[in-house]
Amino acid sequence: MSDMRRLMILFLLVGLAVVLSGCATLSVHSKVNKDGSVESYKLVINTSSFVYGLLAEGAKKEGYESLRESFLSEIPEEMRDKVSYDEVWSGDQVSIIIEARDYVPADDDKVKIRKENGFLIYEDLSFASENNQTSSNELGNALLSSFSLHYYLEMPGKIVESNANVVKDNKAEWHLTGASAFNTRIYAKSEVPGIPGFEAALAIVGLLAAGLLFGRVKG
């Protein structure tokens, strides 16, 4: 299992713990580079101080001083310089912010990026159940009814195909609630921008080559 996949599983476990403990909103902000690497993948969990207290209490029972320490202890050592953890408080509400930066998804990661026929294809299967069906369990649906997922994706080029709720230029948004948030495959297909100035450089090289060829013929 790749380090990034382990980290993604950890992200989801934290999010799931919050969901099962009470109402919550989960936001994902993902930004992709034109070479297919991920510039940043940020997870923001917004919940109440009560739910946070339950999670912190669970962490202390496991021998950790805080929820932060509990989370950071699970991150592979080679990934620690690429991952940050922050908490932002506002009255009775808290935002848990976890971000990974500058990594290339492995083949077994939930986040998959590939180049195909001149396009860049992005998929995130983190929120797609294996059978892709909404649970019929009444208790499960009740627990998830207060859950919201907001996913924001920024691709390096214009998005030409996606299952997002909103698409504008190189950005896409998904806004999901309840059990449907865990039955969704995040998908987008974008153009791959050229290297700035590359076309101009080719034109200059072409003109120089033509000039040399013309000079030789004339000579």
Curated annotation (Swiss-Prot):
The keyword Flavoprotein does not apply. It is found in: Cell membrane. Coiled coil: none annotated. It is a multi-pass membrane protein. GO terms for cellular component: plasma membrane. The chain crosses the membrane at residues 8-28, 194-214. It holds the Pfam family PGF-CTERM. It comes from the Archaea. The keyword Mitochondrion does not apply. Keywords: Cell membrane, Membrane, Transmembrane, Transmembrane helix. This is Uncharacterized protein AF_1487. It comes from Archaeoglobus fulgidus (strain ATCC 49558 / DSM 4304 / JCM 9628 / NBRC 100126 / VC-16).
